[in-house]
């Protein structure tokens, strides 16, 4: 089977990751201890993608949990999934990274990384045919961003031909907890452009908005936000976990969604998102409408400001694929300005008959939209405001970093923004398009 090893780093990464395992272990009919109690063959058919069978029918997640302080692991151990993870797979330091990317990437994190790689190697050896890795982390703190990107680089070095997917929580303007977020995020994006194959971008601001506006929760907690993210992650990985045709592994997903290697940052959305009483049965039309509604997208950049290069949708439950195709076509015709015309058939639809827990039908949306440059631009602007004054820089140079790295990261992110802009402007037969076609291969290197 095509296995995926899951890594979760830092406080945010571990909480999001644990919420993901909480969601999928239920979908596959496993109880809190990992014993299979499902009734449906589809639940067990591809269990081994994310789980490895330990003793007597007990399944254990292929997960490696990493943090630079013990508190997160203690919380997981005492939580409902405490006995679910393999204890040897929890690797943690004592000192924390103090929201400092350099600590996570160069000092504290670098000391711990070999221990983590040993666990990753052991997990990889237990796989028949490893397809790749997925990592959950945030880009605003120290461990998830600094050590997370270090881990991605090291794993990449050791498994160069395997896929690397990341679920990255971007810092957002309204919900800011750390003053150096723009530094940490820019340094991380600099790494992700080079070392990740697909990055699903999520930000807290959009999650808060969804909780408040759509789910009518007055004071959403991180638990609510993580639940939302886990719903989306469960939807995104449906194709890998259940028998299906489209996007059945990480590589096929990337082939369908990444037109140019650097442009692999996706926005994600989920439907139905309604306050619980009213979602009993939504039709295909409402699902599709909701899924393509910017309010349901988990990133605070409105995709109507840009154009979709590619899209992929996953419907779950009892739905008629004919209706789905018609709805998607209708959306594409109605909003044709939001899709680039030089990639024909750029919306893919997939279907899986197993619905998520508690819902009859659901749909998940992945879009590669040029509007994501707005999120990068926002981080970049904050970065330059601070970097021009060299504010807080001593925290980073004190850990052995050089200012040059900041300059490089900034210009790499600016390049990324202008690449997205360039493909947004490129038309079918304007001169731009032809110029880009000549240039594109050189740029991809």
From Swiss-Prot:
Its cofactor is Mg(2+). Its main location: cytoplasm. It is found in: Cytoplasm, Cytoskeleton. GTP binds at residues 11, 69, 138, 142-144, 204, 226. SMART domains: Tubulin, Tubulin_C. Keywords: Cytoplasm, Cytoskeleton, GTP-binding, Magnesium, Metal-binding, Microtubule, Nucleotide-binding. Pfam families: Tubulin, Tubulin_C. GO terms for biological process: microtubule-based process. GO terms for molecular function: GTP binding; GTPase activity; metal ion binding; structural constituent of cytoskeleton. Mg(2+) binds at residue 69. GO terms for cellular component: cytoplasm; microtubule. Residues 422-445 are annotated as: Disordered. It comes from the Eukaryota. Residues 427-445 have a biased composition (Acidic residues). InterPro entries: Beta-tubulin_BS, Beta_tubulin, Tub_FtsZ_C, Tubulin, Tubulin/FtsZ-like_C, Tubulin/FtsZ_2-layer-sand-dom, Tubulin/FtsZ_GTPase_sf, Tubulin_C. Belongs to the tubulin family. Tubulin is the major constituent of microtubules, a cylinder consisting of laterally associated linear protofilaments composed of alpha- and beta-tubulin heterodimers. Microtubules grow by the addition of GTP-tubulin dimers to the microtubule end, where a stabilizing cap forms. Below the cap, tubulin dimers are in GDP-bound state, owing to GTPase activity of alpha-tubulin. Dimer of alpha and beta chains. A typical microtubule is a hollow water-filled tube with an outer diameter of 25 nm and an inner diameter of 15 nM. Alpha-beta heterodimers associate head-to-tail to form protofilaments running lengthwise along the microtubule wall with the beta-tubulin subunit facing the microtubule plus end conferring a structural polarity. Microtubules usually have 13 protofilaments but different protofilament numbers can be found in some organisms and specialized cells. This is Tubulin beta-1 chain. The lineage of its organism: Eukaryota, Fungi, Dikarya, Ascomycota, Pezizomycotina.
